[in-house]
């Protein structure tokens, strides 16, 4: 299956997308529920110099999914556990900043945020 196939699939889901930003000197994540495209872009740009990692989660508490993003060797390393990507694909990819942005924008558009008791445990902006 083509890598970009899932980018064209347009279906809204009721699960919420949450972005957590970690810095090397902090134990706690700064958490943003329903990050905007500008929130995601700012985090990607700052990742190589200011942040340690980005951690995106969505889904209900019975079946949460994640996308973990780190910057290493000039590429963005995305690790995922999501059924939205082709299951034949590896769950780790090293991609350019533009492709990382497109992937994360896709998830931000496709997953609406509905705060419930599962997410209320988070420090949400």
Language-model features, listed with the residues they occupy:
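Acidic, proline/glycine-rich low-complexity IDRs
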Residues: 2-125
């Amino acid at each position: 299956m083509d890598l970009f196939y899932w980018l064209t699939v347009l279906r809204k889901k009721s699960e919420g997308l949450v972005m957590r930003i970690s810095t090397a000197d902090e134990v706690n994540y700064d958490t943003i529920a329903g990050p905007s495209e500008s929130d995601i872009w700012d985090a990607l740009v700052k990742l190589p110099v200011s942040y340690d990692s980005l951690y995106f989660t969505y889904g209900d508490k019975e079946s949460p999914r994640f996308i973990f993003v780190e910057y290493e060797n000039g590429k963005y390393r995305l690790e995922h556990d999501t059924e939205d990507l082709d299951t034949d694909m590896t769950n780790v990819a090293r991609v350019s900043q533009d492709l990382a942005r497109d992937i994360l924008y896709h998830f931000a558009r496709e997953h609406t945020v509905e705060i419930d008791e599962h997410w209320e445990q988070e420090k949400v902006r």
